[in-house]
Amino acid sequence: MMNSLRNTLSSTLSPTITNMIRMDHTAVLETFHQYEIDNSPATKKALVNTACIALEIHAQLEEEIFYPAMRVVSTDKSVLEKSVPEHNEMRRLIAQLRSMDANNPLFDRTFMELMRNVLHHVADEETILLPEAERVMGSRLSELGADMTKRRLQLTAPRAGELASNTLRNFPTSSMLVAAGAVLAGTYLAKRAFEGQGYSRGH
């Protein structure tokens, strides 16, 4: 019974999975908007690191939780079929960026290519996949949101220090704190909400 209550609480506290995906999109796009050609190399590198970590976590969450659920209910799988290949191309560009020095003339070009790919991917999801999910999934949206929150905690924890370091060392402004910290804040607040209700793993 306690497990059932905990699951109900989790679903109630968590945003729907579609809203979580939109929040992820907003956070990474905010990071993109901070990138300028005349930024210092250190600032560029930190921005790119922040965006890349957020994208990797986001892509893994979608592939493990959202896409499998959508494959069951979607009537038009064309966007789904290209989503994972688009993620893989994104990962290829991320690997290139990580291997480059920010002074490399190709660094800006590669990040701009990543930005274009992500913007196209976001447009497909927000105009096709997410509205379809909201039409056909009903209460499953909150359940999947709770699943994504739990998995996000697991994926984010090992990289929290790196995200915080990139943010606090280079971007003391509120906009960058929001951009880099959106993933961390969502998972932290969800965890605190569970603790505040007194439901621990030991119960």
Across the structure, where does each feature detected by a protein language model lie?
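Small-residue-biased structural context
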Residues: 1-203
